[in-house]
Curated annotation (Swiss-Prot):
Enzyme class, first EC level, given as a word: transferase
Species name: Ralstonia pickettii (strain 12J)
Function: Catalyzes the base-exchange of a guanine (G) residue with the queuine precursor 7-aminomethyl-7-deazaguanine (PreQ1) at position 34 (anticodon wobble position) in tRNAs with GU(N) anticodons (tRNA-Asp, -Asn, -His and -Tyr). Catalysis occurs through a double-displacement mechanism. The nucleophile active site attacks the C1' of nucleotide 34 to detach the guanine base from the RNA, forming a covalent enzyme-RNA intermediate. The proton acceptor active site deprotonates the incoming PreQ1, allowing a nucleophilic attack on the C1' of the ribose to form the product.
Reaction(s) this enzyme catalyzes, per UniProt: 7-aminomethyl-7-carbaguanine + guanosine(34) in tRNA = 7-aminomethyl-7-carbaguanosine(34) in tRNA + guanine
Known cofactor(s): Zn(2+)
EC number from the UniProt entry: 2.4.2.29
GO CC terms in record: cytosol
Family: Belongs to the queuine tRNA-ribosyltransferase family.
Descriptive protein name: Queuine tRNA-ribosyltransferase
Chain sites annotated for binding substrate: D90, S91, G92, G93, F94, D144, Q193, G227
Subunit structure comment from the entry: Homodimer. Within each dimer, one monomer is responsible for RNA recognition and catalysis, while the other monomer binds to the replacement base PreQ1.
Length: 383
C-alpha cells in the first residue's frame, strides 16, 4: 500500500507524506543504507533516536546471504532485523551491473557467478519481484539494467544507452506483471534510465507512464531516477537530474538513487526530489570523514589531537553532546570500534537533520533562503 500526499511546494521543492504498510514517512527524506539488513554500526533503536523513518535493504546481497529460507522463517526482513518502520529494497540490478565481466545480460535476465562461492546464478525481473515479496519490503524497486557511464574506457554512446534503457522498460513491464501476479500488498517503484541523454530519459519516462496508465494509474507507486552517480562528471549528473525530476508525475514520490553529498541532497530537493539514499555518511564515518554544518572534518588529522570542542557546536547528536574532537581523533587513530559508531551516529544525524531543516523551509516557503544559508555555512569551513 502507498498513499502519497503532496502537502506544499516552494518552487520545485516538495513537502510530502508517504503512508506505507509499516508507517508514515515525511518527505523529503534520506534513507540510511542497510546492505545486509543492518545499517553499519547502528541498532534499530539508535536509528529511531536520530530520526530515521525508512531504511534501505539490498535484495541481491540478502538473497545470497542469509538466503530466503531465513527470511521466510522471520516472515520477512522486518522480523529478521528488528526494524518495524518502512523498508525500501533495491532490485539487485545495480549490484549485478557492478559485477562487470562476471555477468552476462540477455533479454531473459542476468546470469552471473556468485561473488561468494562462484556458483552460477540467474536473476530476472520475475525472480527479483519474488525475492522482494518474501523480504516484504514496503517499497519494491523494478528490476532494471543500470546504464553505465563508461563502457571500457569511453562514455556509453547514445545507441548503447538507448538499448539499455529500452531493455529496462521491457523489464519494468515484466516487473509490474509479476508484482501483480504475486498480489504484493506493498508499493512498486519504476526507474527512469537513459544515461546522459535527455531524449532517452524522456522516452524512458513516457514508457513507464504508459505502463502506469495501463494499470489505471496504479502501476507504479513512485518514480526513481537511476543511472546517476555512476562515474559521470558532476555537471552531467546535475544536468540530467534537473531535466528529469521536474517531469516526474507530481502526484507520486520522486526518488534519486545512490546520491549523495549534502550539496547533492539540497540540489536534488531544489529540483523536486523527495527521497535519497547513499552509503556516503556511513562509509565516510568509518573512514573518519565527518560532515558538519560548516564543512567537513577529517578527524584523523593532527590538528584535532588536543581540540576539546565537539565536531559541531550546533549539532544535537549524542556524539557532539558528549565527546570532543580530541577523543574522536584518538579513537580513529587507535582503530577503536567505538569511534566508527560515534562517527556514524553523527554523520547520519547530520543528514537526517538536514532533511528535517529542508522540510521546515519548504513548509514556510523559505527554501531559497535556506539554500543560500546552507551554501554560505558549508563554504565557511569547519574551524
Amino acid at each position: 500500500m502507498l498513499k502519497y500526499e503532496l502537502l506544499t511546494t516552494d518552487g520545485l521543492a516538495r513537502r510530502g507524506r508517504m503512508t506505507l504498510n509499516h508507517g508514515v514517512v515525511e518527505t523529503p527524506i534520506f534513507m540510511p543504507v542497510g546492505t545486509y539488513g543492518a545499517v553499519k554500526a547502528m541498532s534499530p533503536a539508535e536509528l529511531k533516536d536520530i530520526g530515521a523513518q525508512i531504511i534501505l535493504g539490498n535484495t541481491f546481497h540478502l538473497w545470497l546471504r542469509p538466503g530466503l529460507e531465513v527470511m521466510d522463517a522471520h516472515k520477512g526482513l522486518h522480523g529478521f532485523n528488528g526494524w518495524d518502520k518502512p523498508i525500501l529494497t533495491d532490485s539487485g540490478g545495480f549490484q549485478v551491473f557492478s559485477l562487470g565481466d562476471l555477468r552476462k545480460i540477455t533479454e531473459d535476465g542476468v546470469t552471473f557467478a556468485s561473488p561468494i562461492n562462484g556458483d552460477k546464478l540467474f536473476l530476472s525481473p520475475e525472480i527479483s519481484m519474488q525475492i522482494q515479496r518474501r523480504l516484504n519490503s514496503d517499497i519494491v524497486m523494478q528490476f532494471d539494467e543500470c546504464t553505465p557511464y563508461k563502457i571500457g574506457d569511453r562514455p556509453a554512446t547514445e545507441a548503447e544507452a538507448a538499448a539499455s534503457m529500452r531493455m529496462s522498460l521491457r523489464w519494468a513491464q515484466r516487473s509490474r506483471n509479476e508484482f501483480e501476479r504475486e498480489k504484493n500488498p506493498n508499493a512498486l517503484f519504476a526507474i527512469v534510465q537513459g544515461g546522459m541523454f535527455e531524449n532517452l530519459r524522456d522516452e524512458s519516462l513516457a514508457g513507464l507512464q504508459a505502463i502506469d496508465a495501463d494499470a489505471g494509474g496504479e502501476g507504479f507507486g513512485g518514480y526513481a531516477i537511476g543511472g546517476l552517480s555512476v562515474g559521470e562528471p558532476k555537471e552531467d549528473m546535475m544536468r540530467v537530474l534537473q531535466h528529469v525530476a521536474p517531469r516526474l508525475p507530481a502526484d507520486k514520490p520522486h526518488y534519486l538513487m545512490g546520491v549523495g553529498t549534502p550539496e547533492d541532497l539540497v540540489a536534488g530537493v531544489a529540483a523536486g526530489v523527495d527521497m535519497f539514499d547513499c552509503v556516503m555518511p556511513t562509509r565516510n564515518a568509518r573512514n573518519g570523514w565527518l560532515f558538519t554544518r560548516f564543512g567537513d572534518i577529517k578527524i584523523k588529522n593532527a590538528v584535532h589531537r588536543n581540540d576539546p570542542r565537539p565536531l559541531d557546536e550546533t549539532c544535537g547528536c549524542y556524539t557532539c553532546s558528549n565527546f570532543s574532537r580530541a577523543y574522536l581523533h584518538h579513537l580513529q587513530r587507535v582503530g577503536e570500534i567505538l569511534g566508527a559508531r560515534l562517527n556514524t551516529i553523527h554523520n547520519l544525524y547530520y543528514y537526517l537533520e538536514l532533511m528535517a531543516e529542508m522540510r521546515t523551509a519548504i513548509e514556510s516557503h523559505g527554501f531559497a533562503a535556506f539554500q543560500a544559508r546552507f551554501a554560505a555555512d558549508r563554504a565557511r569551513g569547519a574551524l
